[in-house]
């Protein structure tokens, strides 16, 4: 194990130290114990302190969908809603587009709702969840719900609107109690609530960057408040490990609900590699992984869980650098194949 960790560290360090990222934080857990925890780079701006895996807060992007998936699972277990229910049971005023849309369609990205267009991804307007629906609710669907798969964060904006009506409380407060507190994820916070955090917490939030042909520049300010369920959280690498470990332990949800969350959907006999808020690749050298890749303004993130090896990897970068995924996969491969199962 020692040699594989050294090789893994060398690969991650090469990515971080060759000016390919402004800052990077990574943690690895094996059989319930942290075996690697390291960060590279500095906070940025006027803060020249080095980042740390236990305390530095990064934007987690779409890993937030995995948190939402567990919150949805909690609601299923509490019989607050069911996957096959129509969203119009909760949002009768939402435009019908001549088609019914189920809660499951939203959670599995099979609703036909479009993705971002124009500068929507970079919007810094302060929307609430229901206000955010106005961005896309009157647009035509790309296909009949259930007929195809199309990944869109707007599915999770609409899903969160339904969930908070079913819960009779705000989406954020339900998630905080039922998921974050339950998993002891004490270092995970709503990004939109950052203004209410202490000065110390703000200091622990890394600056976000965008990559240009001349290097990195500070990313545009964006407001992710309305898409909290899709990509609106800040967290640390070690806290995200707890999210992955929950999938291994099958904690906080009933077994049958975990099966729903972690089972990929099929559309027209084709795999989508997506469950309920969790990406599921079950065709990787007989050693499937579950988790999520996240990409957003000032963020690129990985949560990879390898159940057969009882291995969880969390990696957070403060810039959108999807071109590095192949190099990251190469590093994970070292652990995946060499750590004893």
Locate the predicted segments by residue.
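Active-site SXXK
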Residues: 12, 26, 32, 56-84, ...
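Short clusters of small/polar residues that mark proteolytic maturation junctions
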Residues: 39-41, 203, 301, 317
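Short, glycine/proline-biased beta-turn/loop segments that scaffold the active-site neighborhood
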Residues: 82-97, 182-183
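Short, gly/Ser/Thr-rich active-site loops of penicillin-recognizing serine hydrolases
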Residues: 270, 283-285, 320-341
């Amino acid at each position: 194990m020692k040699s594989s960790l050294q090789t893994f560290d060398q690969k991650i360090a090469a990515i971080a130290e060759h000016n390919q990222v402004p800052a990077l934080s990574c943690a690895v857990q094996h059989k319930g114990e942290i075996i690697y925890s390291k960060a590279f780079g500095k906070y940025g701006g006027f803060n020249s302190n080095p980042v740390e895996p236990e305390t530095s807060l990064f934007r987690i992007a779409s890993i937030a969908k995995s948190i939402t998936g567990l919150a949805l699972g909690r609601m299923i277990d509490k019989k607050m809603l069911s996957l096959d229910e129509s969203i119009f049971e909760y949002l009768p005023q939402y435009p019908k587009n001549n088609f019914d849309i189920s809660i499951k369609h939203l959670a599995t990205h099979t609703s036909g709702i479009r993705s971002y267009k124009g500068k929507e991804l970079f919007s810094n307007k302060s929307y609430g969840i229901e206000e955010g629906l106005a961005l896309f609710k009157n647009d035509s669907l790309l296909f009949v719900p259930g007929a195809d798969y199309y990944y869109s964060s707007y599915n999770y904006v609409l899903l969160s609107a339904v969930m908070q009506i079913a819960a009779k409380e705000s989406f954020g407060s339900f998630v905080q109690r039922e998921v974050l507190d339950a998993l002891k994820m004490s270092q995970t916070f709503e990004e939109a609530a950052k203004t209410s955090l202490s000065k110390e917490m703000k200091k622990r939030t890394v600056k976000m960057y965008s990559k240009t042909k001349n290097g990195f520049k500070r990313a545009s300010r964006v407001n992710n408040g309305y898409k909290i369920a899709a990509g609106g959280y800040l967290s640390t690498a070690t806290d995200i490990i707890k999210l992955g470990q929950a999938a291994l332990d099958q904690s906080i949800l009933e077994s049958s609900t975990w099966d729903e969350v972690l089972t990929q959907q099929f559309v027209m006999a084709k795999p989508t590699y997506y469950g309920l808020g969790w990406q599921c690749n079950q065709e990787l050298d007989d050693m499937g992984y579950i988790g999520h890749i996240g990409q957003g303004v000032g963020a690129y993130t990985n949560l990879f869980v390898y159940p057969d090896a009882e291995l969880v990897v969390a990696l957070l970068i403060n810039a959108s650098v999807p071109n590095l995924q192949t190099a990251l996969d190469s590093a994970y491969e070292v652990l995946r194949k060499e750590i004893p199962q």
